[in-house]
Amino acid sequence: MSQALAVEAPSDRLDQLGALAVFGIAASVLFSIAVAQILLAIAIACWLGVIVVRRERVEVPAFFWPLAAYAGITLVSAAFSIEPRASLVDCKQLVLFLMVPVVYRFITGERASTMVTVILSFAAASAAYGIIQYATITLNPLSQRPHGTLGHYMTYSGLLMLVISVALARILFGRSDRMWAGVVMPALAVAVVVTLSRSAWVGACAAAALLLALKDFRLLAVLPILAAVFFATAPPTVMARFVSIFDVRDPTNRDRMAMLREGEHMIAAHPLVGVGPNMVQVLYSEYRDPEAVEKINPHLHNVPVQIAAERGLPALAIWLWFIAALTVAAARRFHAGGDRFLAAAALAAITAMLTAGMFEYNFGDSEFLMMFLIIVTLPFAADRAAPA
């Protein structure tokens, strides 16, 4: 008996510490990537610890294996990069994929619903801070966009977009705690609007449309009403930014079209392994399109094109396999009945990521990727009982 207690006590402590670390990641990623990554290291250590102490079999959701294969082919691309050392250093981001097994192991059962409450609460605080930032802007809003406590407004708006997907899913499909989601939703919506990030707007709208259709197709009739309210109340700066989405003469639109052509040329020259992770910026001037606006860009502002250009067409095929496997699994979970809001949130997050990802390389953003992997893993973790 004493031997059993001696074995169980350390693993129980590891389980509690691992869960606290993952909760901390979800909260801190909205404010500090450094803190979130430190907590991820702790969570990974706890995960490995319970595997050793309890001799647990490693369990992951099925969609993790395509993601692992994507990590593997990324390393192959790095090995054949024009600057292998720099590309291999950039591959440290692949560690973030371990968000999937740590969430799957530690955020089981009711912890998954609690995790959503944590995300909504800290996102509400972040949104409020961003709105205050916007209210204090005195110069050109496009050059002083709210970014919360994060380093860039695109990262900030992308995270808010994902949280909006989760909040609306809880409002429409949740069995409990819908009130808090409804309370924070206006702040989230206003905060993402004032970032003036068009890709996040489009992604959030796509996610909302999907959720409304899943709930009741007739609810899509709400969208024109919301659009009318937006046009009636939006400040001139926001309206001008919205109109620019459809302006082919807009410099940022022209530059994005040029980046697609640049990506096409990179893919044609390096179809199998790409130019190498983090090498697009290095080679940008060599492939720069004559109609490009900016002299250099760090990436191509399109997830599929960026992956194919950096890592090759086989890597893109594996990434699409990951997305397909994840989407099918989440859809099956949604149609299985029971509490469907976590599966709905996952489907909405996938939709938001893919839609916004046509205009921004969000899958390569560490903060965004961590939050995305948390959200899409939750419905599968919730179905599990904590290992005995």
State what each model feature region is:
Residues 57, 128, 212-253, 258-269, ...:
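A membrane-periplasm/extracellular boundary helix in multi-pass inner-membrane enzymes
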Residues 311-351:
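Hydrophobic transmembrane alpha-helices and their immediate junctions
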Residues 247-258, 273-311:
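Long extracytoplasmic/lumenal interhelical loops at the membrane interface
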Residues 34-50, 90-100, 155-164, 201-209, ...:
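Membrane-embedded alpha-helical segments of multi-pass membrane proteins
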Residues 1-86, 98, 106-117, 171-179, ...:
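Transmembrane signal-anchor hairpin modules in multi-pass inner-membrane enzymes, especially those
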Residues 79-88, 193-194, 358-363:
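Membrane-interface helix caps and helix-loop-helix hairpins in membrane proteins
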Residues 19, 42-48, 218-225, 322, ...:
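Transmembrane alpha-helices of multi-pass inner-membrane enzymes
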Residues 21, 25-26, 72-76, 112-142, ...:
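Alpha-helical transmembrane segments of multi-pass inner-membrane proteins
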